[in-house]
């Protein structure tokens, strides 16, 4: 019920599709404006009303934060990758989360849903050939009451740790 922010680890171009395919209700996402103008990506962004963030424009970044926070507070669901990018063939390694990514959650006072993506990088961002099974794990939401007194870096660390723990748990279970 209501809006919330989804914060997954970022593995590659397939991530948004994997999440949107498995998510039970409509949602949108925030992405780098420069990468949003390629064929099909532009149309997909327009279709789901994604927000295009200019990474080198702090003023526009504040505008996007405010717009998304307002929409989330009004009930919309958004995906934002706090790593800010991904590496080719990343082998399920989670990079540092950018603390500023969590300003939207704080501003909207919405729940945070950590998402652990596993093997998503293999679809478009590796040399893997053949069928691939990817995993999307929606972790227990973190309610505003749980993080309201925390700094954005503390929230980023909390979400990252939960995602890393889930990935480790799943990797051990599938050995």
Q: At which residue positions do the language-model features occur?
A:
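Glycine-centered flexibility motif
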Residues: 1-2, 42, 100, 132
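Non-catalytic C-terminal accessory region of glycerolipid acyltransferases
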Residues: 62-175
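Catalytic core of membrane glycerolipid acyltransferases/transacylases, capturing the structured
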Residues: 2-58
């Amino acid at each position: 019920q209501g809006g919330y922010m989804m914060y997954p680890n970022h593995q590659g171009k397939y991530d948004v599709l994997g999440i949107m395919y498995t998510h039970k209700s409509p949602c949108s996402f925030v992405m780098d404006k420069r990468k949003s103008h390629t064929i099909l990506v532009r149309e997909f962004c327009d279709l789901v009303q994604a927000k295009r963030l200019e990474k080198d424009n702090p003023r526009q970044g504040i505008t996007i934060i405010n717009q998304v926070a307002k929409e989330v507070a009004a009930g919309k669901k958004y995906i934002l990758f706090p790593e800010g990018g991904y590496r080719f063939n990343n082998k399920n390694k989670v990079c540092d989360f950018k603390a500023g990514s969590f300003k939207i959650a704080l501003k909207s006072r919405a729940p945070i849903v950590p998402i652990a993506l596993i093997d998503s990088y293999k679809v478009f961002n590796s040399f893997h050939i053949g069928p691939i099974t990817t995993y999307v794990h929606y972790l227990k939401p973190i309610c505003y009451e749980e993080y309201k007194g925390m700094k954005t870096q503390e929230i980023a660390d909390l979400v990252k740790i939960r995602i890393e723990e889930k990935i480790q748990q799943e990797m051990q279970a599938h050995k």
